[in-house]
Amino acid sequence: MIGYLKGQILSLSEDSVLILVNGVGYEVNCAPVAVSALEEGQETALYIAESISPYDGTVLYGFLTKEDKQLWAIFKTSIPNTGAKKALEYLNKALRSVADFHNAIVKKDPKILTGIFGFTAKTAEKLIHSLDGKMDAVTIAGVPKIKIEGEAPFMSEVMMALTALGYSPMEARKAIDQLYKTGLANDSVENIIRAALRILKK
């Protein structure tokens, strides 16, 4: 069983990598967010998990860290009707901010899962139910960026709006933090979003 590959990247697609190891090219499925961090020609290392598909035989899934592989495995084994490919889709969304995803599951907050990570309401509820108590086993790097204790409740709406426009949770968080410093965070939701966009476009 293959557990780790280290070699040169021959080619990239949106969700896969062709990596050359000792003269052999391995096609590895990866989360698109992980693929975006790689470049053709560079040397890289991937943690590997194998999955058996009735149509494709043995399929390789690759991860940049052991923690990503661990989270994918939890999705695959804990969430009903979730195979290797679907687990990778969930992982790709969670990798936007693993600390915030963990926080949303622990606090049972479907709004963060739908607004920030793009899950449907039905899937968000399924994730919260299925992963209850399971996320404790995951090693979390970083700290949550989405919400601060004592923050105005409508700030989650601002976060959702900014991430829906393509900004990362970290970028949105920094813009909101700046608004708090200037006192503009007490305005209406619409005006706060406009002010945050002005900051982000500088």
Swiss-Prot record:
SUPFAM superfamilies: DNA helicase RuvA subunit, C-terminal domain (SSF46929), Nucleic acid-binding proteins (SSF50249), RuvA domain 2-like (SSF47781). Residues 1-64 are annotated as: Domain I. Residues 155-202 are annotated as: Domain III. One of its GO terms (biological process) is DNA repair. Residues 65-146 are annotated as: Domain II. Has three domains with a flexible linker between the domains II and III and assumes an 'L' shape. Domain III is highly mobile and contacts RuvB. This is Holliday junction branch migration complex subunit RuvA. It comes from Elusimicrobium minutum (strain Pei191). The lineage of its organism: Bacteria, Pseudomonadati, Elusimicrobiota, Elusimicrobia, Elusimicrobiales.
